[in-house]
């Protein structure tokens, strides 16, 4: 089972998607693909930042996010107490406290493989990961 990193979910929104990512997702069972609430937050942050620059794009992105949340509704994993504790442990060991570390903690707690292009962000966490862009 898999946890999509923000970079992979964002790739799926693009008009000219990476064919390897599309192929990978087509081969995965929808019930085996999850999102982290952290990814939703990262995209929301991008929407808010875009509003001042390009309101139309921000609105389109928000509509896409709303649809994505509906599709993944029962497969969006929260940052609950076990995830927060795992994140705290990873953060103390690695010396990082970013969003990718929360995503790694979520995957570790749920026994998921992170699907990402940013493999270097996950290498030190001990989480399993794959790069569908290759």
Question: Each predicted region: which residue ranges?
Answer:
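Short, well-structured N-terminal submotif of metal-dependent ribonuclease cores
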Residues: 1-35, 39, 49-67, 134
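Nucleic acid-binding interface residues in structured DNA/RNA-binding domains
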Residues: 3, 113-116, 123
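A generic structural signal for short hydrophobic patches within well-formed alpha-helices
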Residues: 9, 40-43, 84, 122
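Residues at the C-termini of beta-strands that transition into short coil/loop
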Residues: 37-38, 80, 118, 133
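Active-site neighborhoods of divalent-metal-dependent phosphate/nucleic-acid chemistry enzymes
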Residues: 45-50, 59, 70-117
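Short secondary-structure capping/turn micro-motifs that flank functional sites
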Residues: 103, 122-124
């Amino acid at each position: 089972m898999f946890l999509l990193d923000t970079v992979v979910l964002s790739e799926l929104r693009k008009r000219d998607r990476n064919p390897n990512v599309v192929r990978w997702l087509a081969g995965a069972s929808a019930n085996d693909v999850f999102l982290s609430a952290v990814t939703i937050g990262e995209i929301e942050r991008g929407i808010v930042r875009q509003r001042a620059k390009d309101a139309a794009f921000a609105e389109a992105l928000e509509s896409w996010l709303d649809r994505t949340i509906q599709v993944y509704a029962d497969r969006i994993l929260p940052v609950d107490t076990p995830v927060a504790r795992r994140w705290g442990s990873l953060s103390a060991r690695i010396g990082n406290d970013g969003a990718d570390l929360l995503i790694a903690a979520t995957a570790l707690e749920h026994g998921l493989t992170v699907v990402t292009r940013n493999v270097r962000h996950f290498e030190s966490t001990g989480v399993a990961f794959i790069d569908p862009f290759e």
